[in-house]
Each structure stands twice: as structure tokens, then as C-alpha cells.
Amino acid sequence: ILKVIAEFDEETTAELGRLIGRAVEITNILKNIKEDILGGHVYIPEEFLAAAEIEQGLAAKDILTHKNLYVARRKFAETARSSFAEAYRLLEENHNRNSKPVVYMLNLYHAYFELMDKRGWEIISPKPELKFEDRCRLVMKALLNRGGC
């Protein structure tokens, strides 16, 4: 999508793909954490669990209820935050009229990220939701090139 639709050069495509991919993946992990862990899948990397003093080898359901899970989520979120910032910087430098779908997608995931960040990383349920009006606003923002990029 980055190279074909947005017509970025090879280097920009590779870097944006890496940054956007990381930001979106982490946002999804943080957004879906309860369902994933209840399904037996812990996608937060071990380094962040260890930094939050969550013991290695703990059962998934015990990680879900661990008092320090919010610390691991907050630290993991910093990686997404820096990826969003770098992606926005690169998009700003390489913006063209064909990059609007990329800007919209990044704005959408960033909006989910911001909802979680504002309410606090200790809150895992319910999953954040964007209202229809908010999604429409994000489309207009991308089309009119306001905010984000």
C-alpha cells in the first residue's frame, strides 16, 4: 500500500512500513489484551513483563490479573508512541496527495492508542471504541491534511 498507493520511494516505504507496522501491532496488542490473554496468548514481550516485575513462566490468566500488568503495558506503549511520532514525521516529510489513505489508517490507530493512553494503562476492559463521528472526523482530517500530517 505504501509503495503502490502512496508512491513513496524504496527507503521511505521500508521505513514507514516498519514504523507503522510496529505502531499498529502494538496498539492492537494493547487493545485486545484481555481477549488474547483469556485465549492463552500473551503478546507483550518478555522484556516488558520483566521490567514490570511479572515473573517469567506465569500462567496467562495470572498475568491478566497481575498488579503490575499496567506497568508492562505502559512501557510497551512507549515503543508505539515513538513509532507513531517517527511515522508522522516521515509522512510529513514525504506527504503527497496519494498518501491520504496511509494518513487515515495511522490516524485511526493513533486515535485508539490515545484513548487507551488517556484512560490509563491499568484499564483493560472494555476495549476502546471510536464513535462513527470520530471515524468520520479522521477521514476528513486525512482528506484535508489537518493534524497528524
What are these regions (language model features)?
Residues K3-A23, L30, K34-C149:
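Catalytic cores of Mg2+-dependent Asp-rich isoprenoid enzymes
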